[in-house]
Amino acid sequence: MKKTLLAASAVVALSASFTAGAAETEKPQYLSDWWHQSVNVVGSYHTRFGPQIRNDTYLEYEAFAKKDWFDFYGYIDAPVFFGGNSTAKGIWNKGSPLFMEIEPRFSIDKLTNTDLSFGPFKEWYFANNYIYDMGRNDSQEQSTWYMGLGTDIDTGLPMSLSLNIYAKYQWQNYGASNENEWDGYRFKVKYFVPLTDLWGGSLSYIGFTNFDWGSDLGDDNFYDMNGKHARTSNSIASSHILALNYAHWHYSIVARYFHNGGQWADDAKLNFGDGDFSVRSTGWGGYFVVGYNF
């Protein structure tokens, strides 16, 4: 989920395993030769997308594809499927039963049959990032659409790099004041670096960072117990992944840095009816992922 957001960076890492698998045998090993998918078990620790730190273990379906003009990454999560801490609500304990994020990009070069490359910019896309949290009531629902321009960069190095810049339209946002309006921008950086062969698999380093700014949330009238703004107009989430990929199995360790995670002000003093607490929206969290490609 957004709470994991291995997101599109995992696309490139998984592609290495599919390529390796294809070389091993001419028999098809996967259900599709272009729609690549996996089922994952994800354990998260100290994620900071809400006002309270969250730990949980959940089930995830993940898919990516790149065919002609279509570039896709997406996942669907069943939150807290295998349990979590007291603040983690999900499918079995009256929380959201489903969280989804998709990142479709459509090649402008290929759709217009025009070579728009120049300098290090290889290809241009109409880029999208849509996030949906089903929830069970208004306080658990999110629907956010980022839309804008994306590009792939030729670095001249054995790595891949892509950049996307978006404007954001916010529908539901857990009851926040910025619902049903245009509200800010996002700049996304994603990169992939193959490292080495290890234990019969392929070890890679993957990174992606979301820079969010320009939101109205930091100016609303939601104040903490000390009279300070409880929300912010900006946030950063920066993920750093070591991924070990095989033909079918893959394993990842993720370190993620949050700054104003979920646009919550760090150290804000709040009380939602279960006692006072301090928001810890800035700091490190982590994930461990085990998945099967099919």
From Swiss-Prot:
Membrane-topology descriptor: Multi-pass membrane protein
Signal peptide boundaries: 1-22
Location(s) in or outside the cell: Cell outer membrane
One GO BP annotation of this record: monoatomic ion transport
Alphabetical list of SUPFAM superfamilies matching this protein: Tsx-like channel (SSF111364)
Cross-referenced Pfam families: Channel_Tsx
GO CC entries: cell outer membrane; pore complex
Keyword rRNA-binding: no
Family: Belongs to the nucleoside-specific channel-forming outer membrane porin (Tsx) (TC 1.B.10) family.
Name of protein: Nucleoside-specific channel-forming protein Tsx
Lineage: Bacteria, Pseudomonadati, Pseudomonadota, Gammaproteobacteria, Enterobacterales
